[in-house]
Amino acid sequence: MSLKALDYESLNENVKNCQYAVRGELYLRASELQKEGKKIIFTNVGNPHALGQKPLTFPRQVVSLCQAPFLLDDPNVGMIFPADAIARAKHYLSLTSGGLGAYSDSRGLPGVRKEVAEFIERRDGYPSDPELIFLTDGASKGVMQILNCVIRGQKDGILVPVPQYPLYSATISLLGGTLVPYYLEESENWGLDVNNLRQSVAQARSQGITVRAMVIINPGNPTGQCLSEANIREILRFCCDERLVLLGDEVYQQNIYQDERPFISSKKVLMDMGAPISKEVQLISFHTVSKGYWGECGQRGGYFEMTNIPPRTVEEIYKVASIALSPNVSAQIFMGLMVSPPKPGDISYDQFVRESKGILESLRRRARMMTDGFNSCKNVVCNFTEGAMYSFPQIKLPSKAIQAAKQAGKVPDVFYCLKLLEATGISTVPGSGFGQKEGVFHLRTTILPAEEEMPEIMDSFKKFNDEFMSQYADNFGYSRM
């Protein structure tokens, strides 16, 4: 019998080949256990509100008024909403062509893009053009749009850091391109060695692959490191020499938990370097409302800014964006509020600062608690989370555990994470889902569980790990191939 169009066997092979570990086997098993009544702690996704982070008050007030503009005509509105929230709601409604239910320009509302440009100028000290900023349904959609323009076929390669966020591997696979890995150095706090980049490019070219772009994730996901200014300079010189477009995933730029290495944007470093390099390197920078102290993942708000991209290429990207008509308009309002929050003297300023600082300070404490907790466990080592929302400990698995995983038909770190899930309800992501060096095993967990629950979670992990290591202990120690 002949196959129908959507029978599994006749599906697009790119769809079948792409994998997304963050919602893979572990997540599916966790969902099954939850249906059976087991308490599950979903630390597999950087989803702050799902783990109890409270929304910031001011942006929710503004968007509520935008969603229900009839409230603005109520004579009692000033008794419920502060005057600055009312004023901002009127401002954003005036930017639309018919409220939040009307399509915007396919690049996003011009007024919001102007606010994003002003934010970038304040952050970096260099001009930003609203015409080169596109608002998107989360940063992920922007990444997919740009990769779609870069990848022409299977012989086009994208340099991606390993460990990497599987958005990149999945999208590259879906678009029919080739992922070219470059490995971060765990012993150097997940630093980047440009020599490794050169080797990766040379190896790819020897296989007939044309490397066209490089991805950096700063701060890192899943690794949690912040790139130094010197490292970013090296990367930009490398991209200039190799004529690569640099994709700067900077969605965690608010999530910084130490003072020694602040976030520095790729654009600022590029502009600081001056001509000719500042005029040569093609750069796309991404940001979102989903991370930081906002954590508005479900709103799906993001943007990308283009630097040194030719006008005709910008027109083509605009054309492709137009196919989807309009990004989510309420999310565009959230983006405007993120880049232009209450200012000193505004009625809502003190509350906004209190809420945002409280979230960041708590995340900093949780990052330390989780790192210290992992490092107190047998056969577990973990670099401190400098930024982002994750810990990425290395699990030194005994050879007996590796053999047991093989017999069960599982990758060793998947085997470990499944056992952890079954025993404790903690849902993590195995390091193999992000890529890692051969014979080395990790897991990724968010640092997002409520601060008051963190000691119990880490105690539960330690108890499980001690029992696991005792059960599979052998005379050969752990794997460090």
UniProtKB/Swiss-Prot annotation:
Name of the protein: Glutamate--glyoxylate aminotransferase 2
PANTHER family xref list: ALANINE AMINOTRANSFERASE, GLUTAMATE--GLYOXYLATE AMINOTRANSFERASE 2
UniProt PTM comment: The N-terminus is blocked.
Compartment(s) where it occurs, according to its Swiss-Prot or TrEMBL record: Peroxisome
Family: Belongs to the class-I pyridoxal-phosphate-dependent aminotransferase family. Alanine aminotransferase subfamily.
Pfam families noted in UniProt: Aminotran_1_2 (PF00155)
Residue numbers covered by motif Peroxisomal targeting signal: 479-481
MF GO annotations: alanine-glyoxylate transaminase activity; glycine:2-oxoglutarate aminotransferase activity; L-alanine:2-oxoglutarate aminotransferase activity; mRNA binding; pyridoxal phosphate binding
Cofactors: pyridoxal 5'-phosphate
Pathway membership, UniProt: Photosynthesis; C4 acid pathway; Amino-acid degradation; L-alanine degradation via transaminase pathway; pyruvate from L-alanine: step 1/1
Gene3D superfamilies for this protein: 1.10.287.1970, Aspartate Aminotransferase, domain 1 (3.90.1150.10), Type I PLP-dependent aspartate aminotransferase-like (Major domain) (3.40.640.10)
Keywords assigned: Aminotransferase, Peroxisome, Pyridoxal phosphate, Transferase
EC number(s) per entry: 2.6.1.4, 2.6.1.2, 2.6.1.44, 2.6.1.-
UniProt cross-references to InterPro entries, sorted A to Z: ALAT1/2-like, Aminotransferase_I/II_large, PyrdxlP-dep_Trfase, PyrdxlP-dep_Trfase_major, PyrdxlP-dep_Trfase_small
Positions bearing N6-(pyridoxal phosphate)lysine: K291
Subunit structure: Homodimer.
Gene that encodes the chain: GGAT2
Keyword Glycosyltransferase set for record: no
GO biological process: one example: biosynthetic process
Tissue expr: Expressed at low levels in seedlings, leaves, flowers, roots, and green siliques.
Transmembrane feature ranges: none
Domain of life of the native organism: Eukaryota
Role: Catalyzes the Glu:glyoxylate aminotransferase (GGT), Ala:glyoxylate aminotransferase (AGT), Ala:2-oxoglutarate aminotransferase (AKT) and Glu:pyruvate aminotransferase (GPT) reactions in peroxisomes.
GO cellular component: chloroplast; chloroplast stroma; cytosol; mitochondrion; peroxisome
Reaction(s) catalysed (UniProt annotation): L-alanine + 2-oxoglutarate = pyruvate + L-glutamate; glyoxylate + L-alanine = glycine + pyruvate; glycine + 2-oxoglutarate = glyoxylate + L-glutamate
